[in-house]
Amino acid sequence: GLMDMVKGAAKNLFASALDTLKCKITGC
């Protein structure tokens, strides 16, 4: 459903943001 898509997109966005933050802090 639509809510599942929204939740999935939010989860992906959050995960990629977390990865970016981790890269900034620890270096990739």
Swiss-Prot record:
The keyword Secreted applies. This is Ranatuerin-2AVb. The keyword Ubl conjugation does not apply. Disulfide bonds join C23-C28. Keywords: Amphibian defense peptide, Antibiotic, Antimicrobial, Disulfide bond, Secreted. Expressed by the skin glands. GO terms for biological process: defense response to bacterium. Its main location: secreted. It is found in: Secreted. Has antibacterial activity. GO terms for cellular component: extracellular region. It comes from Rana arvalis (Moor frog). Belongs to the frog skin active peptide (FSAP) family. Ranatuerin subfamily. InterPro entries: Antimicrobial_frog_2 (IPR012521).
